[in-house]
Amino acid sequence: GDVCFSHKDFAGVHFTGSTQVFNAMWETIGKNIGRYRSYPRIVGETGGKDFVLAHKSADPDVVVTALLRGAFEFQGQKCSAASRAYIPSNIAEEVKKKLVAGVRQFKMGTVEDFSNFINAVIDGKSYNNIKQYIDKAKKDPKCQILVGGKCDDKEGYFVQPTVIETKNPTSTTMCEEIFGPVLTLYVYPASNFDKALELVDSTSPYALTGSIIAQDRKAIEHATVKLRHAAGNFYINDKPTGAVVGQQPFGGGRASGTNDKAGSQLNLYRWLSARTIKETFNPPIDFRYPFLQEK
């Protein structure tokens, strides 16, 4: 990195990784800006703290399925995974009951058995990071483990899919990226949807993916406008994951990156350098414009 970032011909970087590393890269590029022949193009795809927001009109079964798939596929080890959920009080008990039941149905094991929904997390570092978030939640008086919460690294790095309910909408697991099978939910008053929208928009520095689940069309349209800066990929009545390269341009803003939409022609525009060429076929031979000859 140091060799590239200090070279006079350095022209750009397309980075996928953590927000912290991307910030450090940007800082290094800024310090070296006087060395470059041109201003570098900088594109970043970084972290996420992706949300599912349910409206009081939402079908509980749709909410539960979106959470089970969105939070726990690939053990939550993708930047688009659902990590925080906002559930209205009128359907909260049903959602929690079915969510817990669904998690308990998951089979956990190695990847050779395709019937296993949950596998090990990628390595010991990731395992320890996820475990410390779960341990903190266990000690937090405002948090309750609804299901899961156990970890085992005797053979492989296995973390039970874990659902946490918090009474504090700004608790650690509602704000920070975990990158593991941990979902935190907050129950909000069903009559105060606008407050929930504010929480979704302001709680996390990230803005990668998110979804609204509702049957009320006005609520969907309202959320789509209010959360326009909260998610670069916004899903309606679905989980906040699964963008298909070439069909659904992917990327987010704020601390999630530069929102240059990988997998689409929008991204390619960042790497173009437009050049305008003019050729005159009847060049002038007198500097005087016609109006200068007027009397």
Predicted regions: what they are:
Residues 6-8, 12, 18-169, 190-194, ...:
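ALDH superfamily catalytic-core signature
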Residues 244-245, 249-266:
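Conserved phosphate/anionic-ligand binding catalytic regions in large, soluble enzymes, centered on
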Residues 181:
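Glycine-rich nucleotide-phosphate-binding loops and adjacent flexible coil segments
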Residues 184-186:
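Active-site donor-binding acidic/aromatic loop of nucleotide-activated sugar
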Residues 174:
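Short, solvent-exposed loop/beta-turn-alpha elements that line the ligand-binding surface or hinge
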